[in-house]
Amino acid sequence: MFLLYEYDIFWAFLIISSLIPILAFFISGILAPIRKGPEKLSSYESGIEPMGDAWFQFRIRYYMFALVFVVFDVETVFLYPWAMSFDVLGLSVFLEAFVFVLILIVGLVYAWRKGALEWS
């Protein structure tokens, strides 16, 4: 029971930092005007009247390419601390990292065969 006294500041900070955004959204919802005129519903293109339809579809290839990039970018974030402390951690952590990289290589080969890396 006495060990919980060390976390009083943490809990107070957590409660206050949770209440501030909730109160901000609540107060802005009360004070904000709710009129939706034609200007509010029109598309905005850098201060110029929109020409044509403002909504158009992107090709799924862009999303797939970005998704593969994010996966391998996160992989580097996970592998960097491991590489910096490789000499301290030992063989078991090396094997775990090897399995991690192997799974990612299998994913890369799968994405390659499905054509997710083809740009044309």
Curated annotation (Swiss-Prot):
Superkingdom, natural source: Eukaryota
Name the record gives this protein: NAD(P)H-quinone oxidoreductase subunit 3, chloroplastic
One Pfam family named in its UniProt record: Oxidored_q4
Purpose: NDH shuttles electrons from NAD(P)H:plastoquinone, via FMN and iron-sulfur (Fe-S) centers, to quinones in the photosynthetic chain and possibly in a chloroplast respiratory chain. The immediate electron acceptor for the enzyme in this species is believed to be plastoquinone. Couples the redox reaction to proton translocation, and thus conserves the redox energy in a proton gradient.
InterPro entries recorded: NAD(P)H_OxRDtase_bac/plastid, NADH_UbQ/plastoQ_OxRdtase_su3, NDAH_ubi_oxred_su3_sf
Family: Belongs to the complex I subunit 3 family.
GO terms classed as biological process: photosynthesis, light reaction
Sample GO molecular function, one term: quinone binding
Species of the source: Jasminum nudiflorum (Winter jasmine)
Gene3D superfamilies: NADH:ubiquinone/plastoquinone oxidoreductase, chain 3
Catalysed reaction, written as an equation: a plastoquinone + NADH + (n+1) H(+)(in) = a plastoquinol + NAD(+) + n H(+)(out); a plastoquinone + NADPH + (n+1) H(+)(in) = a plastoquinol + NADP(+) + n H(+)(out)
Broadest EC class assigned to this enzyme: translocase
Keyword Transmembrane helix in record: yes
Transmembrane segments: 9-29, 64-84, 88-108
Locations listed in the record: Plastid, Chloroplast thylakoid membrane
Keyword field: Chloroplast, Membrane, NAD, NADP, Plastid, Plastoquinone, Quinone, Thylakoid, Translocase, Transmembrane, Transmembrane helix, Transport
Known EC number: 7.1.1.-
Iron as UniProt keyword: no
Lineage of the organism: Eukaryota, Viridiplantae, Streptophyta, Embryophyta, Tracheophyta
Membrane topology: Multi-pass membrane protein
Self-association and partners: NDH is composed of at least 16 different subunits, 5 of which are encoded in the nucleus.
GO cellular component annotations of the record: chloroplast thylakoid membrane; NADH dehydrogenase complex
